[in-house]
Amino acid sequence: MTTTRRNKRNNKLYKNIKAIKLSIASNDTILNWSEGEVTKAETINYKSLKPEPGGLFDEAIFGPVKDYECACGKFKKIKYRGVRCDRCGVWVTESIVRRERMGHIALVSPVAHIWMSKELPSPSKISLVLNISYKEVEQVLYFVNYIVLDTGKIKDDKIMPFKFKEVLDLTGKGSLSTRQKMRRVIGYIFRNLIKSKSSEDYRKGKIFYESLKNSSLPFSLNDAFNYIKKYTGFRVGIGAEAILELLNKIDLNLEFSRLNDALRKAKKDSVEDAKVKKILRQLETISWFRNSKLHPKNMILHTVPVIPPDIRPIIQLDGAKFTTSDINNFYRRVIIRNDRLRRILEDGTVPSIVVNNEKRLLQESVDALFDNSSRHKPSLSKDKRSLKSLTDRLKGKQGLFRHNLLGKRVDYSGRSVIVVGPELKMYEVGIPALMILKLFKPFIIHGLINKFDENGNEIRPIAASIRQAEDMIKNQDDLIWGIVYDVIKDRPVLLNRAPTLHRLGIQAFEPRIVDGKAIRLHPLVTTAFNADFDGDQMAVHVPLSENAVNEARAVLLASKHILGLKDGRPIVTPTQDMVLGNYYLTTERKGQLGEGIIFSTVYEARAAYESQKVHLHAIVGISTKAFPNKKFACQGTLITTVGKIIFNDVLGNNVPYINDGEFDENACPEKFIVKQGEDVRQSILKHQIIPAFSKKVISKLIDLLYLLLEFKDLPKTLDNIKALGFKYSTFSSTTVSVFDIPKYTNKQNYFDSADQQVLKYKQFYNKGLLTDDERYKRVVKLWNNVKEKVSDEIQNLIKQEQYRDNSIVVMADSGARCNISNFTQLFGMRGLMSKSFNYERNNQSKIIKDTIEVPIKHSFFEGLTINEYFNSSYGARKGMTDTAMKTAKSGYMTRKLVDATHELIINHDDCGTRKGIVVEAIVETKTKSLIESLFDRIVNRYSITPIVDPETQKTIVEANSLITTQLAKQICATSIKEVLVRSVIYCERENGICQYCFGIDLSTGKLVELGTAVGVIAAQSIGEPGTQLTMRTFHTGGVSTENNLAQGFERLKQIFEVVTPKDFEKAVISEVKGTVKSITTVQNAQEVVIKSNVDERIYTIPFSAQIRVHVGDQVSPGSKITEGSVDIKQLLRIAGIQRVRQYMIVEIQKVYRIQGIDIADKYVEIIIRQLTNLLQVTDAGNSNLFVGQLVHSHYLNELNKSLLLAGKMPVIAINQVFGIDEAASKSNSFLSAASFQDTKKILTDAAVKNQVDYLLGLKENVIIGGKIPAGTGFLTDEELTFLGSKTVAEEY
């Protein structure tokens, strides 16, 4: 007989998932998921290789192995779909259901879920709910000790000393005490409760009484407990059954009230107190269970779900061998042990100790299945490898989240070495013909077999079949190329260079077919990719869908990425050959061929140069009317060179004539123009030579071009500058020769003098006048000074007139290659070399000796001695390892930053906030040097209140208005020292940020668009330059000065991870507002007294610390009294969250700007928003929250508004600061947090909470395979198509 049913599989794509809920599955739920019970441990039949019925791969449970074919072969083909075979019981359907259908194993004895019973380092959920320690729960579950389930009828503590839920230690140190208690109870029973002394029970009681006295005598504990139970009703239990009974008895409401009362009696203010912490943890877990309406008994399993077989496959290898997923081994063990326990229990004659042992083995086998790695002794394979359980499949870099869901291998991709493509346009890339034929193969085949043209007319196809088309492609038939060109014309490709540190690491290009096997890359985009042509490889990806193609063109095309993200400066600046060519082109020289000629048109000047009547560098005149589209301060004859006329000719309209490096953005200055009636030739003779355009000038010019030109014209102009550079660097005939190096001979005198000084230091040390540390510091300083003198002299030498046209000097001067340090090493001296040093170790010396004190005196030109070469190799290797370390650490930090901020997306125009941050110039207080100007901090942001000139009372910027470059300059020209601006920190959008709080998008120079993923951009902008930061930690002599603190990467890590600074680098800060009354020296320390309006505070400071205040100075809470790093958590306690945020912004900017890296404040603020937006409840008021709970500031504000409007008591909470690790883990999305770190803990907490993930961030949507709610995810398909076609129309 056959039966039919509707196929349970829903073929609809899960595109409209709005949210995902995670909760603890009850036993009923597991049975509901299941398609049948797995009763056998077998997998497949070794002869037929078919799944065994009732086994782990049973087709009746999990579905057919072959599409629409039952196991016995009675029903085949799609026409029987939905039919169940009456012989083998298999539903006839698609085999893909074997990836979806689940089974179950019905357990004979309940077991605890290991996630709920073992959660180190924090207590497990079971121990928190039952209020017994984690260790005791473990002892009960693994049949080591019994737990009291019922204290019975006797309520007198003297007779019945056992407490409810007390774990009876019968194996450890407390066993003697437990035995004594049991003796007391048994003694009472046989003396007082048994009337007949001759009865069997009296005799038994006496035996138990004696046995408990002498631990060497064997007796059955179970019998003893049954004896006590018979007369008193006292009951104990062991294993998961006992825990289940206790969980069934729990009253969550009663428990919640009890914990709240306990919290009120405890020290409520001190959340750090151990007792309070324990109560808060319990309260949190009980609250989660109460609010989720889940019963704690679900933490104990009666059935184990069996995951679909195709997720744990058996794979056939060569030579009739098989390999299987580790999970199958775990399931087999569970089934075998479960069956054995069933037989034992059915027998009924087996001693309880053996039964308990079998139950323990079953518990352990289920533990191993769920989480093998967290067990004391994980299950191992034959080769002693720890087997991968279900938890291991989820967590880590190779786990499901990071390996399969967030990062997948991509089809339609290729990779090859890159070479320069100077002939390409900015949006083009040269792809080898072989690669094109592979990547675009399906599209080319479609074109070859297509029977209709683009107008719908029937045509004769080039190939008759797909096979023929494939052969034509394989043989590279001449007929295919027309189709190939048509295909690539419609399809851009994405180029990616690893490591992708920021979004410019992936850009789109229009492909062009090139010969060879290397990808040809446009030279201007190399900076964005951080690529060079020394063997770098790049990957190519093909966007397949129409929307993907449109998105690639509309958003990712390389010609759209002119500005860098972190600072808004052009990232497509010409380099090397291009710089050199433009430098040569714009060079001026007196006495050149054709000097003094006056031209009336640009064409005339070009013709004269091409017919060799005038030299490129000759100073000539040209009428300003020759440039009708360029602005001049006045009309007349412009004094310039033919090279500059050619250079300006490619810059396009609306750009003023560029005649020197100090150009004006409005018009060419009057000083270069000879007015009518004045002697032009005389002016040419008097003309001062203007330096040629170096790399800095060209970079500044690109800034100007970005402001003046329309966006669509800019890439073309940049291409023109590139083409000029390559052309004229060829014409310049610049060569490099060892004989170009200038001769420098003066260094020996410095060396002789320094050698004598080193000898003196050694003598002083031998006499005990200097310590070894002092001698070392002086020697290193001496040789550094010598190198500086040599370097200065070389710098002066190469500036001499005789080296004006020297090829190497020209390269350095133009910025094309090399700098003064290279020259010093090339023909001066190499100087001191660094050596490896463990900065973390505690060494006896108080200074870091990471420099070899013997310098390399020879230059590369002279050649190094063997000793010098050997010494220099230390530094070279240290450089390589440091770079590798920095790259890894920086990459990890970027990942953490992205995880903490990815949910921040621009999703509104104006949140209407009235709060902002006060910004002022960041100045190094000790040296008074400027780190970040007020202009840099306010430009491209929105004001909150009107900004008024204090002198004239004139409003410069209206309230809620953009501070443009022009307005920022006006503000800085007044006496205004601080400005209140809008900030992402105080944006009132709950999920995301509004446009006005963020301000201008630095990559476009316009108001940030809706859908911009500013969180990820901020993380990339801060993480990407991380590799450029120094790794060195300076601490000299234990003295804490500004220079001796953790710097560079280590300091950044200290701030982002909110690490308490070490004692020697920690700054003492004032707790009060007041005046420094006195600074005195007391025994072994200094005392600073600060007088406030209320009292006086005395701060005792060791001599090793450097005091930065003086008597009479005004201080406020949080002001530094000594130099050093402030403990952020201490600052929060003393001065509040606002001060903490300001301090963190300033300190992060210091780290980057000292290294010469500019990052916009707004990116730093985004990170700080995520680190400081949680509060801890101190008084729950009339809300459902509990004391100690962490809540988001936006949620709290809304909750308090509703409470106050209802006339109820609001919630009181204090701000908290978390490091980026914790910030990422405390995300509202459990999918995002679980894919970051602590996967097991986050999923356990989410399941207990019955948590709903509303998929608001980027990662959650990538995980479920949906569109991210950012970028073009905000656009309709029609808008995207329009943007894509508009970009094609703008291509030049």
Swiss-Prot record:
Q: Which domain of life is it from?
A: Bacteria
MF GO annotations: DNA binding; DNA-directed RNA polymerase activity; magnesium ion binding; zinc ion binding
What is the documented disruption phenotype for this protein? Probably essential, it was not disrupted in a global transposon mutagenesis study.
* Gene3D superfamilies xrefs: 1.10.132.30, 1.10.150.390, 1.10.1790.20, 1.10.40.90, 2.40.40.20, 2.40.50.100, RNA polymerase II, clamp domain, RNA polymerase Rpb1, domain 3
Write out the catalysed reaction.
RNA(n) + a ribonucleoside 5'-triphosphate = RNA(n+1) + diphosphate
GO CC annotation, single: DNA-directed RNA polymerase complex
Q: Which residues bind Zn(2+) 2?
A: 911, 987, 994, 997
User: Would you kindly state one Gene Ontology biological process term found in this protein's UniProt entry?
Assistant: DNA-templated transcription
Name any cofactors this protein relies on: Mg(2+); Zn(2+)
The keyword Nucleotidyltransferase is assigned to this record: yes
Residue sites binding Mg(2+) per the record: 532, 534, 536
EC numbers: 2.7.7.6
Q: Which Pfam families match?
A: RNA_pol_Rpb1_1 (PF04997), RNA_pol_Rpb1_2 (PF00623), RNA_pol_Rpb1_3 (PF04983), RNA_pol_Rpb1_4 (PF05000), RNA_pol_Rpb1_5 (PF04998)
Q: Where does Zn(2+) 1 bind?
A: 70, 72, 85, 88
Ordered alphabetically, the record's keywords are: DNA-directed RNA polymerase, Magnesium, Metal-binding, Nucleotidyltransferase, Transcription, Transferase, Zinc
- Co-factor binding comment: Binds 1 Mg(2+) ion per subunit. Binds 2 Zn(2+) ions per subunit.
Task of the protein: DNA-dependent RNA polymerase catalyzes the transcription of DNA into RNA using the four ribonucleoside triphosphates as substrates.
What family does the Swiss-Prot or TrEMBL record give for this protein?
A: Belongs to the RNA polymerase beta' chain family.
Q: Which HAMAP family is this protein grouped with?
A: RNApol_bact_RpoC
Q: How does it assemble?
A: The RNAP catalytic core consists of 2 alpha, 1 beta, 1 beta' and 1 omega subunit. When a sigma factor is associated with the core the holoenzyme is formed, which can initiate transcription.
UniProt protein name: DNA-directed RNA polymerase subunit beta'
Record the organism.
Mycoplasma genitalium (strain ATCC 33530 / DSM 19775 / NCTC 10195 / G37) (Mycoplasmoides genitalium)
Read off the lineage from the record: Bacteria, Bacillati, Mycoplasmatota, Mycoplasmoidales, Mycoplasmoidaceae
The coding gene here is: rpoC
